[in-house]
Amino acid sequence: MWLGTYFGGLNYYHPIRNRFKNIERIPFRNSLSDNVVSCIVEDRQKNLWIGTNDGGLNLYTPDTQQFVHYALQENQREDGFGSNNIKSVYVDEPRGLVYIGAHAGGLSILHRNSGRIENFNQRNSRLINENVYAILPDGENNFLLGTLSALVHFNPEKRSFTTVTQESDGTPMNLQKITTLFRDSQKRLWIGGEEGISVFKQHGTSIQKAAILPESTVTKAFTNYIYEAANGLIWVGTREGFYCFNEKEKRIKRYTTANGLPNNVVYGILEDSYGRLWMSTNRGISCFNPETEKFRNFTEADGLQSNQFNTSSCYRTSDGEMYFGGINGLTTFRPELLQDNPY
């Protein structure tokens, strides 16, 4: 849209580009510590905790647009982060703690009041693998950790790690290269990663596979993200498109570029207030209407940080704002403002 002004010349306004806002690293200014964003979480104060690939952890206050950086410094490995490549974050509000999983850095705990950081690795604990890609509370004040070699149970009070080696019936647990953990509304545990997806029932420290998934390629597909919509449908983002699991109908349906998806690598999935699904891919962001099964796709030309996004790097805040992390920072927007363009 071109706008003529009295003394200001001719201005160009793009109704779509101006709906997207990007947050990026700006050298020598208070900004994002690194442009490659790997995880995003909101706390009760509506601050965002943003993990990056090489810049550690960022605490971002949207109202003031100010950042606080937490990163590994030289000669600090004994009492700081084990790595600046952050893969997962969980905020424990009642205890004022932030749990941080890293690639090649183990598990760290940030004490928000004091700023003290504890780090657990293979040298000082029984953590079997220092690549912690997912952190999930188990409902009993303990945590499950998804690592690249096993599922690990962590007891914060005892500061103890237990590798889950078998199911409760004795069946060996051979899950490796776990990249995402999810708990559905029925309290079942979903584990996804390079080797596919599995569903378990959990009771304390014991878990047992739940045979709810019908035979499908999704069980073997490299899983990036698992999401439950408000209507109870489970959506799974993979490197081979995304899948919808309808448990009532015992049916799985797959969507790919043949259906209108811009790219088959789906990194993250979020639902808006209209029931539409927003997905980050390797070719921009796609909005999918489950009722009509129609796609609306957005690219870097529409104002995104890049066409490429990152695994599990997405979050919908309590205010309805959506954030997707990519290779050039964050793209944020309110989906309700992105109405269909009639032209």
Language-model-derived ranges and their functions:
Residues M1-Y343:
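Carboxylate-rich, polar loop motifs that coordinate divalent cations or form catalytic acidic clusters
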